[in-house]
Protein backbone atom coordinates (compact mmCIF):
# COMPACT_ATOMS: atom_id res chain seq x y z
CA UNK A 1 0.00 0.00 0.00
CA UNK A 2 1.37 3.39 -0.99
CA UNK A 3 0.46 6.45 0.99
CA UNK A 4 0.57 9.92 -0.43
CA UNK A 5 1.70 12.77 1.78
CA UNK A 6 -0.50 15.80 2.13
CA UNK A 7 0.69 18.74 0.00
CA UNK A 8 1.87 20.66 3.08
CA UNK A 9 3.91 17.72 4.32
CA UNK A 10 5.42 17.07 0.90
CA UNK A 11 6.41 20.72 0.46
CA UNK A 12 7.85 20.88 3.97
CA UNK A 13 9.75 17.62 3.45
CA UNK A 14 11.33 18.98 0.27
CA UNK A 15 12.36 22.20 2.03
CA UNK A 16 13.74 20.29 5.02
CA UNK A 17 15.63 17.95 2.71
CA UNK A 18 17.44 20.87 1.08
CA UNK A 19 18.09 22.45 4.48
CA UNK A 20 19.43 19.20 5.95
CA UNK A 21 21.81 18.69 3.00
CA UNK A 22 23.07 22.26 3.45
CA UNK A 23 23.48 21.80 7.20
CA UNK A 24 25.42 18.56 6.69
CA UNK A 25 27.78 20.22 4.22
CA UNK A 26 28.29 23.26 6.44
CA UNK A 27 28.95 21.14 9.53
CA UNK A 28 31.60 19.07 7.76
CA UNK A 29 33.38 22.11 6.33
CA UNK A 30 33.11 23.97 9.65
CA UNK A 31 34.53 21.00 11.57
CA UNK A 32 37.47 20.69 9.19
CA UNK A 33 38.34 24.38 9.39
CA UNK A 34 37.77 24.60 13.13
CA UNK A 35 39.81 21.46 13.90
CA UNK A 36 42.76 23.19 12.23
CA UNK A 37 42.66 26.05 14.77
CA UNK A 38 41.17 24.33 17.84
CA UNK A 39 44.45 23.62 19.63
CA UNK A 40 44.14 26.96 21.40
CA UNK A 41 41.50 29.59 22.00
CA UNK A 42 42.18 32.54 19.71
CA UNK A 43 40.08 35.21 18.08
CA UNK A 44 39.70 32.99 15.01
CA UNK A 45 38.70 29.86 16.93
CA UNK A 46 36.25 31.87 19.04
CA UNK A 47 34.74 33.40 15.90
CA UNK A 48 34.33 29.96 14.35
CA UNK A 49 32.68 28.69 17.53
CA UNK A 50 30.25 31.65 17.50
CA UNK A 51 29.41 31.06 13.83
CA UNK A 52 28.12 27.52 14.44
CA UNK A 53 25.11 28.48 16.60
CA UNK A 54 24.46 31.47 14.31
CA UNK A 55 24.10 29.06 11.40
CA UNK A 56 21.75 27.07 13.62
CA UNK A 57 19.70 30.28 14.03
CA UNK A 58 19.55 30.81 10.27
CA UNK A 59 18.57 27.17 9.71
CA UNK A 60 15.83 27.37 12.35
CA UNK A 61 14.44 30.52 10.69
CA UNK A 62 14.32 28.73 7.33
CA UNK A 63 12.82 25.66 8.98
CA UNK A 64 10.15 27.73 10.77
CA UNK A 65 9.15 29.47 7.55
CA UNK A 66 8.89 26.24 5.59
CA UNK A 67 7.12 24.32 8.37
CA UNK A 68 4.19 26.63 9.07
CA UNK A 69 1.81 24.52 6.98
CA UNK A 70 2.57 21.35 8.94
CA UNK A 71 2.50 22.58 12.51
CA UNK A 72 3.43 25.23 14.97
CA UNK A 73 7.01 26.48 14.75
CA UNK A 74 7.09 27.47 18.45
CA UNK A 75 9.88 25.04 19.31
CA UNK A 76 11.90 26.37 16.40
CA UNK A 77 11.53 29.86 17.87
CA UNK A 78 12.83 28.46 21.16
CA UNK A 79 15.80 27.03 19.26
CA UNK A 80 16.43 30.42 17.65
CA UNK A 81 16.49 32.12 21.05
CA UNK A 82 18.69 29.44 22.62
CA UNK A 83 21.17 29.50 19.73
CA UNK A 84 21.36 33.31 19.80
CA UNK A 85 22.09 33.16 23.52
CA UNK A 86 24.72 30.51 22.86
CA UNK A 87 26.43 32.68 20.24
CA UNK A 88 26.54 35.63 22.63
CA UNK A 89 27.66 33.36 25.47
CA UNK A 90 30.44 31.87 23.35
CA UNK A 91 31.65 35.32 22.31
CA UNK A 92 31.87 36.31 25.97
CA UNK A 93 33.29 32.97 27.14
CA UNK A 94 36.01 33.17 24.49
CA UNK A 95 37.82 35.73 26.61
CA UNK A 96 37.53 33.56 29.74
CA UNK A 97 39.17 30.39 28.44
CA UNK A 98 38.41 26.93 27.17
CA UNK A 99 36.52 25.74 30.29
CA UNK A 100 34.03 28.61 29.97
CA UNK A 101 33.59 27.91 26.25
CA UNK A 102 32.97 24.22 26.92
CA UNK A 103 30.36 25.06 29.57
CA UNK A 104 28.46 27.35 27.19
CA UNK A 105 28.82 24.90 24.29
CA UNK A 106 27.66 22.05 26.51
CA UNK A 107 24.64 23.92 27.84
CA UNK A 108 23.68 24.89 24.30
CA UNK A 109 24.06 21.30 23.06
CA UNK A 110 21.82 20.00 25.86
CA UNK A 111 19.01 22.52 25.31
CA UNK A 112 19.22 22.49 21.50
CA UNK A 113 19.34 18.68 21.59
CA UNK A 114 16.17 18.53 23.66
CA UNK A 115 14.44 20.87 21.22
CA UNK A 116 15.65 18.82 18.24
CA UNK A 117 14.45 15.61 19.85
CA UNK A 118 10.96 17.01 20.55
CA UNK A 119 10.68 18.56 17.07
CA UNK A 120 11.70 15.23 15.54
CA UNK A 121 9.10 13.37 17.58
CA UNK A 122 6.37 15.80 16.53
CA UNK A 123 7.38 15.35 12.86
CA UNK A 124 7.54 11.55 12.94
CA UNK A 125 4.64 11.16 10.53
CA UNK A 126 6.55 13.14 7.91
CA UNK A 127 9.23 10.49 7.75
CA UNK A 128 12.99 10.87 7.90
CA UNK A 129 12.92 12.07 11.49
CA UNK A 130 14.49 9.15 13.34
CA UNK A 131 17.99 10.47 12.64
CA UNK A 132 16.92 13.83 14.08
CA UNK A 133 15.41 12.19 17.16
CA UNK A 134 18.57 10.15 17.76
CA UNK A 135 20.78 13.17 17.07
CA UNK A 136 18.81 15.27 19.55
CA UNK A 137 19.22 12.64 22.24
CA UNK A 138 22.93 12.30 21.51
CA UNK A 139 23.31 16.10 21.68
CA UNK A 140 21.95 16.02 25.21
CA UNK A 141 24.53 13.41 26.18
CA UNK A 142 27.35 15.16 24.31
CA UNK A 143 26.46 18.50 25.87
CA UNK A 144 26.63 16.96 29.31
CA UNK A 145 30.07 15.54 28.49
CA UNK A 146 31.32 18.94 27.27
CA UNK A 147 30.14 20.52 30.49
CA UNK A 148 31.95 17.83 32.49
CA UNK A 149 35.08 18.12 30.31
CA UNK A 150 35.34 21.79 31.25
CA UNK A 151 36.51 20.65 34.70
CA UNK A 152 39.25 18.39 33.31
CA UNK A 153 42.89 19.12 34.02
CA UNK A 154 43.60 20.09 30.42
CA UNK A 155 40.26 20.78 28.66
CA UNK A 156 40.31 20.81 24.86
CA UNK A 157 38.07 22.28 22.19
CA UNK A 158 38.51 19.36 19.82
CA UNK A 159 35.71 17.26 21.33
CA UNK A 160 33.28 20.16 21.03
CA UNK A 161 34.36 20.65 17.42
CA UNK A 162 34.00 16.93 16.75
CA UNK A 163 30.37 17.23 17.84
CA UNK A 164 29.58 18.67 14.40
CA UNK A 165 30.62 15.53 12.53
CA UNK A 166 27.98 13.10 13.84
CA UNK A 167 25.47 15.93 13.50
CA UNK A 168 26.39 16.23 9.83
CA UNK A 169 25.96 12.49 9.34
CA UNK A 170 22.52 12.55 10.98
CA UNK A 171 21.44 15.53 8.85
CA UNK A 172 22.62 13.69 5.74
CA UNK A 173 20.71 10.52 6.66
CA UNK A 174 17.57 12.53 7.45
CA UNK A 175 17.84 14.39 4.14
CA UNK A 176 18.11 11.15 2.22
CA UNK A 177 15.16 9.62 4.09
CA UNK A 178 13.05 12.75 3.52
CA UNK A 179 13.49 12.25 -0.23
CA UNK A 180 10.69 9.68 -0.26
CA UNK A 181 8.26 12.00 1.51
CA UNK A 182 9.18 14.93 -0.72
CA UNK A 183 8.50 12.86 -3.87
CA UNK A 184 5.25 11.24 -2.71
CA UNK A 185 3.00 14.08 -3.78
Regions found by a protein language model. Give the residues of each.
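Alpha-helical membrane segments in multi-pass integral membrane proteins
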Residues: 104-115, 129-146, 160-170
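Structural signature of hydrophobic alpha-helical transmembrane segments
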Residues: 40-54, 95-110, 161-166
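Membrane-water interface at the C-terminal end of transmembrane alpha helices
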Residues: 118-127, 146-152, 167-184
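Membrane-proximal helix-loop-helix units in multi-pass membrane proteins
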Residues: 85-134
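N-terminal topogenic module of multi-pass integral membrane proteins
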Residues: 1-70, 179-185
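Structural signal for membrane-spanning alpha-helices in multi-pass inner-membrane proteins
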Residues: 31-34, 60-63, 90, 116, ...
Amino acid sequence: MTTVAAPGISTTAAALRRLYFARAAFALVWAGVTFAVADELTGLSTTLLVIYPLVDVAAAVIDARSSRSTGSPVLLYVNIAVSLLAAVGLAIAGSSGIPAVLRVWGAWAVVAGLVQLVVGVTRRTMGGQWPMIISGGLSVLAGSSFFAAASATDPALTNAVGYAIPGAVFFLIAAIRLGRTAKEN
